[in-house]
């Protein structure tokens, strides 16, 4: 048995300088990372005999070792603390769950550039606008730009293989650059207007469009004037929706709200006086449950944890914390930019602040209510399946394909708080007979649980398989083969009517068949997970199928680049006509030699 931590001996040698401390348990697992102006004073507060909050007392009870790192000042300590939290994600720290990269609007290079959504490393050549608080905010901006200026948003592979305009051209949301229906000069002007909007210069853009409209009207070019009039009206409507009264500059309005059981931080992004969007964050609450502690932890992780994240000039917050000065100094050190944090604001800015507080409160209350509802369903499922404990992790699998084409298996994961989307997985199924769902499911389970056997990932408490007796038997064989024979399996088969509420369930083997009443909370949970697995499989299948159908077999031919491929398709009128052509006919196309024609013909008829 390990010796209890000797706090007195540790504190006797502890420095009183600024720094970072790390607390470990008996198995050397990092429990908590903190910073302090005075390490000795801060650490002594953990080991007093009375007055500790329950979570803090639980943390102290697990401490077996404490390590400290002395820093030159509090700002340096804050930066080191955030680095360690991001790397190790200690269980007793406040943690942002949503740490994925934020989306940008991407404008590609080229004569006819495209607009699209981009996440991750900025490797592609072009311009990036953002980041936006959510993909929904970007889609809203892209939809507006498509209606107003008709800059293409299709993938380059799709664009390069067009021989006639697509539906977007027919509904006047694209000008058909793929088939030469717009000049490079006219398209460049539409791109320039789109860039002005994305840069927040909407007022200047509106004035410019007004001047162009008057000029077109004076020249009796009424069709062009009407087009500009519609663009101006659309722009004004968006300005009315997005501009905050009295707003200007770049501001993030951040409000934190804490209730027993959780916390929510609501962020409203305002750029150039225009609202780009808003987003809710639900951080994992550690030992600090005060709203000011949640706010300080959020600001540190959000603005210091990602060097690429766009930094506003000002933050408006609903609470104050002693760390705010250190945070602004750390931003200056790390980002080379000044940041002000305001709390006491008036007028319009006070209304922004209150709006963020209201949104945070409502979002947290809704989340807690949903969590209680979900927890009740998990308890009902435990009773139905006669489990000793309420399950904490459910996995469900489904298969999707179109007559065997582009087969995809999905894995969705649920816990008592709802879907765990970061744990979702898709599997592109290869090497099985087209349309063989059993073989596809077998491959997906082998891949998933083979990794779990190797130490990657977590084993669920219950495995749901959509498909009935055959799929359940196959899943049981895979689990026994991999050494997970004790795992609870639940097969879900549609009833005779194939309507929701009439599902037939199989527990562990086909002999244990049963049904549940339509109003059963356990059945509702099963249906929810099954439907989510189905949705996730279908979206993955459609994406894979669409990519395969957009990819031309010409793309694999050496010497046939995008321009030559496009010219070749235009010459023959499409891929179908090119497929019918002989080698001699292909060689007659402009720029195609006999040798290249043979390569093209071989590629088109390789199957």
From Swiss-Prot:
Family annotation (PROSITE patterns): GIY_YIG, UVR, UVRC
InterPro entries for this protein: GIY-YIG_endonuc, GIY-YIG_endonuc_sf, GIY-YIG_UvrC_Cho, Hlx-hairpin-Hlx_DNA-bd_motif, RuvA_2-like, UVR_dom, UVR_dom_sf, UvrABC_protein_C
GO CC terms of this entry: cytoplasm; excinuclease repair complex
Keywords for this protein: Cytoplasm, DNA damage, DNA excision, DNA repair, Excision nuclease, SOS response
SUPFAM superfamilies: C-terminal UvrC-binding domain of UvrB (SSF46600), GIY-YIG endonuclease (SSF82771), RuvA domain 2-like (SSF47781)
Broad class of the protein's primary localization: cytoplasm
Record domain GIY-YIG: where: 16-94
Gene Ontology annotations of biological process type: nucleotide-excision repair; SOS response
GO molecular function: DNA binding; excinuclease ABC activity
UVR domain residues: 203-238
Transmembrane domains' residue ranges: none
Subcellular localization: Cytoplasm
Family in the record: Belongs to the UvrC family.
Quaternary organization: Interacts with UvrB in an incision complex.
PANTHER family named in the record: UVRABC SYSTEM PROTEIN C, UVRC/OXIDOREDUCTASE
NCBIfam families cross-referenced by the UniProt entry: PRK00558.1-5, uvrC
Role played: The UvrABC repair system catalyzes the recognition and processing of DNA lesions. UvrC both incises the 5' and 3' sides of the lesion. The N-terminal half is responsible for the 3' incision and the C-terminal half is responsible for the 5' incision.
Protein name, UniProt field: UvrABC system protein C
Species: Pseudomonas entomophila (strain L48)
Encoding gene, per UniProt annotation: uvrC
């Amino acid at each position: 048995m390990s010796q209890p931590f000797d706090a007195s001996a540790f504190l006797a040698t502890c420095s009183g300088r600024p720094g970072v401390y790390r607390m470990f348990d008996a198995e050397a697992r990092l429990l908590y990372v903190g910073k302090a102006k005075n390490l000795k004073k801060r650490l002594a507060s953990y080991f007093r005999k009375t007055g500790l909050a329950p979570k803090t007392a639980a943390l102290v009870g697990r401490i077996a070792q404490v390590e400290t790192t002395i820093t030159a000042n509090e700002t340096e300590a804050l930066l080191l603390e955030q680095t360690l939290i991001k790397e190790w994600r200690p269980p007793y720290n406040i943690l942002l769950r949503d740490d994925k990269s934020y989306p940008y609007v991407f404008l590609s290079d080229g004569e006819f550039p495209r607009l699209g959504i981009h996440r991750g490393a900025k490797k592609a050549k072009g311009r990036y606008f953002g980041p936006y608080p959510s993909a929904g905010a970007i889609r809203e901006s892209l939809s507006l730009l498509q209606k107003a200026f008709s800059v293409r948003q299709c993938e380059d592979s799709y664009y390069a293989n067009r021989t006639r305009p697509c539906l977007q051209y027919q509904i006047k949301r694209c000008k058909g650059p793929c088939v030469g229906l717009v000049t490079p000069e006219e398209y460049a002007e539409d791109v320039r207007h789109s860039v002005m909007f994305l840069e927040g210069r909407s007022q200047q853009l509106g004035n410019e469009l007004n001047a162009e409209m008057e000029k077109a009207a004076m020249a009796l070019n009424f069709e062009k004037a009407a087009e500009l009039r519609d663009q101006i009206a659309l722009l004004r409507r968006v300005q009315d929706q997005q501009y905050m009264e009295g707003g200007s500059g770049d501001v993030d309005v951040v409000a934190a709200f804490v209730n027993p059981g959780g916390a929510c931080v609501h962020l409203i992004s305002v750029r150039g006086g225009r609202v780009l969007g808003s987003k809710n964050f639900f951080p994992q609450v550690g030992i600090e449950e005060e709203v000011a502690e949640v706010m300080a932890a959020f600001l540190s992780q959000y603005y210091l944890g990602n060097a690429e994240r766009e930094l506003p000039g000002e933050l408006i917050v609903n609470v104050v914390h002693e760390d705010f000065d250190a945070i602004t100094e750390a931003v200056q050190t790390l980002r080379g930019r000044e940041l002000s944090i305001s709390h006491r604001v008036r007028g319009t800015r006070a209304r922004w602040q209150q709006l963020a507080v209201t949104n945070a409160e409502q979002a947290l209350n809704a989340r807690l209510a949903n969590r209680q509802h979900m927890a009740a369903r998990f308890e009902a499922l435990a009773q139905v399946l006669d489990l000793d404990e309420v399950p904490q992790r459910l996995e469900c699998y489904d298969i999707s394909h179109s007559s065997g084409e582009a087969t995809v298996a999905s894995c969705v994961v649920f816990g008592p708080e709802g879907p765990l989307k970061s744990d979702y997985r898709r599997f592109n199924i290869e090497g099985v007979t087209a349309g063989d769902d059993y073989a596809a499911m077998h491959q997906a389970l082998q891949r998933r649980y083979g990794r779990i056997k190797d130490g990657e990932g977590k084993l669920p408490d219950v495995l749901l398989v959509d498909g009935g007796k055959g799929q359940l038997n196959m899943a049981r064989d895979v689990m026994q083969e991999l050494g997970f024979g004790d795992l609870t399996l639940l097969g879900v088969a549609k009833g005779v009517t194939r309507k929701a509420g009439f599902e037939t369930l199989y527990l562990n083997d086909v002999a244990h068949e049963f049904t549940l009443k339509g109003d059963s909370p356990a059945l509702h949970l099963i249906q929810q997970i099954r439907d989510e697995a189905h949705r996730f499989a279908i979206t993955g299948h459609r994406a894979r199928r669409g990519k395969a159908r957009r990819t031309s077999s010409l793309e694999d031919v050496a010497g046939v680049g995008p321009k030559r491929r496009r010219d070749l398709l235009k010459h023959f009128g499409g891929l179908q006509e090119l497929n019918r052509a002989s080698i001699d006919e292909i060689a007659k196309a402009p720029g195609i030699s006999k040798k290249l024609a043979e390569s093209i013909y071989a590629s088109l008829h390789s199957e």
